Amino acid sequence: MRQLINHIVNHDLFRWSVVTAMIFYRYSETCMEVTVRVGDPVTLGSGHGYHPGQKVHWYNQSCVGIGNGENTHPICTYDPPKPGRQKTMKTTPLPSPLLYECHNSTLSILHVNVSDPRNYCRRKCPPKGNCEFPTCFTLSLISRTTTRKPEQKTTLLRLKTTPNKHTQHKRSTRRTSPKDYNVTGLPKGFADSFTGNVEAHRTKDAAHSAWILIIIIIIIVVILFFFKIPQRLREKWDTKGYLYKGTDGLPTTD
């Protein structure tokens, strides 16, 4: 065990392991999962981490191949405002009716349908230099039929015992009514009211917990090497003859 610790200290394996873990986490296809109910709006991403001047592209697909320029057709692009101009938002192609709104580093889906893509990808590009590595988001849909209010239980039981054709037909058409998918006539800035989406914030916190753990490990490593704790332990073991052996195979006692 002591030889293993000595080998780790001498070759800085602990520091390299932390760097390797950060690289794998950064370039892995780890998607932030966002839970949303079918028919509700949802906001992906957050305004944190956005640097002024960045152009943000959103794709309704996985991030695989985005960096290589393969099949990269953004559904929404946030173009930061130029000095003296108002902000601009482009959707390519322009959907009808409007389904997406992007602002800074967030994408607001105004109405989530069952047929919508599950994977979304965000890529930030500074005015000069290379674009950042894309970030992946995954939608986890909850069906409306799986959740019922407590006051609806009596009505549902009554429908089972005394069926009413008119009521059942009304329920059926209500579930498939095209009005559920009507998003026209929405006020400007509609998506801004959903930036406080609770599920999105929970997902953001869960994804950032891995980075917090890595930062804590780095701080511990810096403290250890700043106070020269590994070197002191090594010198202490050297005086006790734990690290080196003489020609006879026994620990030295110099």
Curated annotation (Swiss-Prot):
Compartments (UniProt record): Host membrane
Record membrane topology: Single-pass membrane protein
GO cellular component: host cell membrane; membrane
Keywords: Host membrane, Membrane, Transmembrane, Transmembrane helix
Transmembrane segments annotated in the record for this chain: 207-227
Domain of life, source organism: Viruses
Compositional bias (Basic residues): 166-176
Region (Disordered): 163-182
Keyword Transmembrane helix attributed: yes
Primary location class: host cell
Similarity comment text for this entry: Belongs to the RL11 family.
Name of this chain's protein: Uncharacterized protein UL10
Gene coding for it: UL10
